[in-house]
Curated annotation (Swiss-Prot):
Gene Ontology terms for molecular function: ATP binding; phosphomevalonate kinase activity
GO cellular component, one term: cytosol
List of residues binding substrate: 170
Protein name, per record: Phosphomevalonate kinase
Organism lineage: Eukaryota, Metazoa, Chordata, Craniata, Vertebrata
Length: 192
């Protein structure tokens, strides 16, 4: 059963490695579709907010792409895993509260339990989108391998997921990316 709030027409669950461009892609989609039609939901938002409260940290600084956030990343991952083990839908329920737009873009789906929760809760309106980028492209965006982060479940949990409904290649070829976004936007419009 869906939590309180509106029932979406489409839920797109975006996943991908760090610096693959998940936020870039979801923000590009929202800018084309409009914020009145399309909401970007971030599972990391309530996780970081709760973590900041419990650890006396600056929540706003945990939201940006800063060294501040990176210095707490490993412990946040561990803490988030403990929360999910106790209640797999904890963060999922938090992000959908009060969302009124018909299209939901979950920009940071990282675990099978997240996909399962959305599929069980919203059924056929849920689709998975994998954003992929070459290691070289990710490095150009500032990615550096960090042991305990890039080899943790939060980065690798969906590597063997199987058949994603959509795969967006974000290797730096703007024209190719635009073509792919165009196809996805056509699909979104078919659901409105």
């Amino acid at each position: 059963m869906a939590p309180l709030g509106s029932v979406p027409r489409l839920v797109l669950l975006f996943s991908g490695k760090r610096k693959s461009g998940k936020d870039f892609v979801t923000e590009a989609l929202q800018s084309r579709l409009g914020a009145d039609v399309c909401a970007i939901l971030r599972l990391s938002g309530p996780l970081k907010e709760q973590y900041a409260q419990e650890h006396g940290l600056d929540f706003q600084r945990l939201l940006d792409a800063s060294t501040y956030k990176e210095s707490y990343r490993k412990d946040m991952i561990r803490w988030g895993q403990e929360k999910r083990q106790a209640d797999p839908g904890f963060f999922c329920r938090k992000i959908v509260e009060g969302v009124s737009q018909p299209i939901w873009l979950v920009s940071d789906t990282r675990r099978l339990s997240d996909i399962q929760w959305f599929q069980e809760t919203y059924g056929a309106v849920t689709q998975t989108v994998r954003v992929v980028a070459t290691e070289q492209s990710r490095q150009q965006r500032g990615w550096v391998f960090i042991p305990g982060v890039d080899d943790a479940e939060s980065e690798c949990g969906l590597d063997d997921f199987g058949a994603f409904d959509w795969v967006i290649e974000n290797h730096g070829d703007e024209q190719h990316l635009e073509e792919q976004l165009g196809h996805l936007i056509e699909f979104v419009h078919s659901r409105l």
